């Protein structure tokens, strides 16, 4: 083989290798571009997810702040309600007897006039009695308006919830534990006893001795 032939074969081999290299590079280029495009797409998706997460976080923070502010407002309102309720209770306790005190002023005025009249020279006892009875009637009316009832159990059966026995007397005419005498009236407010009535109650009297027993002893 001549030198020219060998040179031609070498040149042909180089051209073939160069052509194959170019073909390989051309085949790798789309793959590299696809990989680069995929990386860019993945990066874009990650960025979108991060943006969405940040937006969701901001919305959650805003809702949390709104809920906290509502909680603070509710607590402040509750404290105001408690203060108003406490003030109302204190006011009710302080002025609980305001109405009855106002009604009792008329009774006091009547008593003062009666005392003044009694001190005058030549005071008429009958008029003083009438004035006292009128004052007592006024007081009874005031008590009735406030649901204060008398406990006057004359002749009734003894009730330990409303009466207090201060003495007992034998009696043939009454059943045992009958109220014989009311020493002091009691009073009740609605169903609550303010003061029990002080009473004398009956007890069973001893049986009289059989008739004729004295004659037999004599």
From Swiss-Prot:
GO terms for biological process: protein folding. It is found in: Cytoplasm. The keyword Cytoplasm applies. Residues 1-66 are annotated as: Disordered. The keyword Zinc-finger does not apply. GO terms for cellular component: cytosol. Residues 1-21 have a biased composition (Basic and acidic residues). Pfam families: GrpE. One of its GO terms (molecular function) is protein homodimerization activity. Keywords: Chaperone, Cytoplasm, Stress response. Homodimer. This is Protein GrpE. It comes from Alkalilimnicola ehrlichii (strain ATCC BAA-1101 / DSM 17681 / MLHE-1).
């Amino acid at each position: 083989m001549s030198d020219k032939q060998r040179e031609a074969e070498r040149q042909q081999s180089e051209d073939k290798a160069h052509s194959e290299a170019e073909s390989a590079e051309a085949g790798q280029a789309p793959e590299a571009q696809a990989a680069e495009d995929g990386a860019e797409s993945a990066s874009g998706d990650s960025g979108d997810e991060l943006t969405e997460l940040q937006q969701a976080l901001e919305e959650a923070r805003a809702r949390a702040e709104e809920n906290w502010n509502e909680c603070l407002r509710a607590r402040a309102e509750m404290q105001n309600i408690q203060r108003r309720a406490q003030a109302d209770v204190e006011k009710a306790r302080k002025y609980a007897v305001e109405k009855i005190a106002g009604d009792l002023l008329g009774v006091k005025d009547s008593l003062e006039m009666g005392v003044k009249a009694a001190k005058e020279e030549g005071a008429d006892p009958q008029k003083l009695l009438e004035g006292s009875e009128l004052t007592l009637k006024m007081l009874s009316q005031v008590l009735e308006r406030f649901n204060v009832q008398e406990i006057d159990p004359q002749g009734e059966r003894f009730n330990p919830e409303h009466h207090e026995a201060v003495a007992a007397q034998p009696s043939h005419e009454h059943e045992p534990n009958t109220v014989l005498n009311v020493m002091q009236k009691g009073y009740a407010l609605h169903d609550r006893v303010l003061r029990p009535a002080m009473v004398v109650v009956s007890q069973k009297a001893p049986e009289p001795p059989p008739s004729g027993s004295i004659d037999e002893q004599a």
